[in-house]
Curated annotation (Swiss-Prot):
GO terms for cellular component: mitochondrial inner membrane; proton-transporting ATP synthase complex. It is found in: Mitochondrion inner membrane. Keywords: ATP synthesis, CF(0), Hydrogen ion transport, Ion transport, Membrane, Mitochondrion, Mitochondrion inner membrane, Transmembrane, Transmembrane helix, Transport. PANTHER family: ATP SYNTHASE SUBUNIT A (PTHR11410:SF0). F-type ATP synthases have 2 components, the catalytic core F(1) and the membrane-embedded component F(0), linked together by a central stalk and a peripheral stalk. The central stalk, also called rotor shaft, is often seen as part of F(1). The peripheral stalk is seen as part of F(0). F(0) contains the membrane channel next to the rotor. F-type ATP synthases form dimers but each monomer functions independently in ATP generation. The chain crosses the membrane at residues 36-56, 95-115, 125-145, 164-206, 211-253. Belongs to the ATPase A chain family. Gene3D superfamilies: ATP synthase, F0 complex, subunit A. This is ATP synthase subunit a. NCBIfam families: ATP_synt_6_or_A.
Amino acid sequence: MTNNYINSPLDQFIINNLLEINSPFLNLSTLNFSTFSLYTLFVVLVISLTFILSIGGESNNLVKGSNWLIAIEAIFDTILNMVKGQIGGSVYGRYVPLVYTLFTFILVANLIGMVPYNFALSASLIYIIGISVSLWIGLTILGLFLNKAVFFSLFVPSGTPLPLVPVLVLIELLSYTARAISLGLRLAANTLSGHLLMSILGNLVKNLMSINYFTFIFGLIPLAGIFAIVILEFAIACIQAYVFAILTSSYLKDSIYLH
């Protein structure tokens, strides 16, 4: 009998405790070091190493810089132009670091999750929705700080007839609150579905190719399709990080300008 590394397509999303901290006096279960913590730390280390390589590259030319530095500057310039186009005005620059950090973190987490048998951080609903809810709370506080009570005019579209105000306020409030969930849910759903698709198709092709020589040769056709899906998933990993950054910039604009 053949032993599989993964018995179920969902096994790759299970959070396992790697180091447990127990105390007879205090509940320290939340301080356990799990795969969740390990991969979060790994993502941060990869981002830090990337910046170190960009600074200490082979080239000492201060104008040209290393290849790592050129790549990072290209990404930063893309995010800068995107935030400038979304927010505009003279205040957009102060929010570029936030959007760039979110984009970089999600991009690296998505790419690390593409490695076979890895834990996908962005496929964890609790993790990603936790980020989106925290971001939504922060943007709401920012809107209240900048606009005071005028912030609540965001829930009343201009020109609304007085009898329709209660209904529209409820609709706008629900729409605004849904951002806290939809921002992270979109990313997690795309990542989860992509990983499940690759895992299920990979197991099916493996079982097909292990029957006999004929099915092994025939299985090369769907195997090529799986390689195409993997390439597509890499593209989706980059696109989803960019979409998250765009939506964050759009929500920032609403908090600043109330429209």
